[in-house]
Design a protein with these regions (language model features):
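Conserved "HGTGT" condensation-loop signature of ketosynthase/thiolase-family condensing enzymes
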Residues: 1-173
Length: 173
């Protein structure tokens, strides 16, 4: 695998969604209505990392963030704990899955689309997933995203990696 693009964004949390939406729209030209800050910062990070890179039809999206305490995610986790079926709208509305949906749709990513929750070694976990899919010939490009938030900042790292020919048809050459 070789890294072909990357970006890092950091915004103060006090930056309101409307201002962030305007910034993303001005820089990217994307229609970004009704999106949360989490999704907006990722769209911009991917846009900057991608630059002029032409993603192949065989691309995947691998993202990671700390588990969020949004109502939808909490409701979904409670349902799982109580052995109740997950409500489709709860799953779709969870922050990470919603962000991945918009990113994949915006950048025409039709391959694997995975969001994991983890606070440690996030980029390494994403890379391992992407390496596995590359070794199986499922993808040629991968977008790796990592979000972090604290009480003051929102941060997002985006990396674009591509298969450098190291993987053969049946795994590592």
């Amino acid at each position: 695998m070789k890294e072909v693009g990357s970006s890092y964004l950091s915004f103060e949390k006090k930056l309101d969604v409307k201002s962030l939406r305007q910034l993303v729209k001005q820089e990217t030209g994307l229609q970004v209505r009704r999106m949360d800050s989490f999704t907006l910062i990722a769209l911009l990070a991917v846009y900057r990392a991608k630059g002029d890179i032409e993603l192949s039809a065989k691309s995947g999206l691998y993202s990671c963030a700390d588990y969020f305490s949004s109502d939808s995610m909490q409701s979904m986790l409670i349902d799982v704990h109580q052995n109740n079926p997950i409500k489709p709208l709860s799953f779709v509305a969870s922050v990470g899955n919603a962000a991945n949906y918009y990113i994949a749709n915006t950048y025409a990513i039709d391959g694997p689309n995975i969001f994991i929750g983890s606070s440690k070694q996030a980029i390494e976990k994403n890379k391992l997933l992407a390496e596995t899919d590359m070794s199986l010939g499922l993808i040629e490009h991968a977008i790796l995203l990592v979000w972090q938030e604290d009480e003051n900042q929102r941060e997002c790292w985006a990396k674009i990696i591509q298969d450098d020919g190291f993987f053969g048809e049946r795994g590592v050459v």
